[in-house]
Amino acid sequence: MMKRMAGTIVLIVTLFSIPTWPGDSSPLFLQAERNAWQAQEALRHCYHYIHGWLAHRDPVSGLIPRNLTRSWFWNAQDSAADNYPFMVLAASLLDRDLYQTTLRQMLQTEIRLTNRLDNLPDDFDFATQKFVHPEIELPRLIFGGSEYMKDGLMPLTEWLGPTEWTGRMIGIMESVWKHAPVDTPRGKLPAGDHEVNGDQLQTLCRLYWMTGDERYPAWAFRI
């Protein structure tokens, strides 16, 4: 009995010794409350974004289309560069099961179906389950791969750290420079335009600091 009373007294003292919550009238509390609601809304939209696009995957390949209107095919510079990596990033925060299963499987499928020249991906048609273009056009492949690395795979790697998506980026970079077609006095370049070479500069510099591979600054200085 005495032990029970002593326990009750300790509980009462503990409860009343807890600092009081600032309450709804505190500016800091109100700001924190607004921040919490805004964060919740943002995360809810991200969650619906992931599942919304997954609902429109090609039922055969499991890849996502370029858009939901006229482009029922996968491509590197849109489907891959601007959409899929951010589904992965959002799922890493909001749906770990989806991140570990479906979204990882999509990468393996992408590599298996869309690699056209070594690790360089090309447009993949869902209606035929074949490449959209009958012939390899190197500038298209290098542009798509460069956009995918800079816009999608690099931000994903900077958030998650080294993953299989990092391996995908390194593989594409290797193939870009293996097949670089533009002759210059300092050696081959991937392209003669500022967009592709700009993509390359942004990716090469960051890859060097991640890996220490001396080829990356050498290629960047060549550009």
Regions found by a protein language model. Name each.
Residues P22-I223:
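Glycan-recognition and catalytic cores of secretory/periplasmic carbohydrate-active enzymes
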Residues M1-I9:
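Bacterial N-terminal signal peptides that target proteins for export
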Residues T8-S17:
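Bacterial N-terminal signal peptides
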